[in-house]
């Protein structure tokens, strides 16, 4: 179902965010994009 797809995307996004968070300034960039 659609919910399963959303959960899968959320997991992938979480992994990407964790990888980016290890880079300097990446967290700041993500915060700017979310606003």
Swiss-Prot record:
One of its GO terms (molecular function) is toxin activity. The keyword Secreted applies. The keyword Secreted applies. Expressed by the venom gland. Keywords: Amidation, Secreted, Toxin. It is found in: Secreted. Its main location: secreted. The modification Glutamine amide is found at residue 35. GO terms for cellular component: extracellular region. Belongs to the cationic peptide 04 (cupiennin) family. 02 subfamily. This is Cupiennin-2d.
């Amino acid at each position: 179902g659609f919910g399963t797809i959303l959960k899968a995307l959320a997991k992938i996004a979480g992994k990407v965010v964790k990888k980016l968070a290890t880079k300097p300034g990446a967290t700041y960039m993500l915060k700017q994009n979310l606003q």
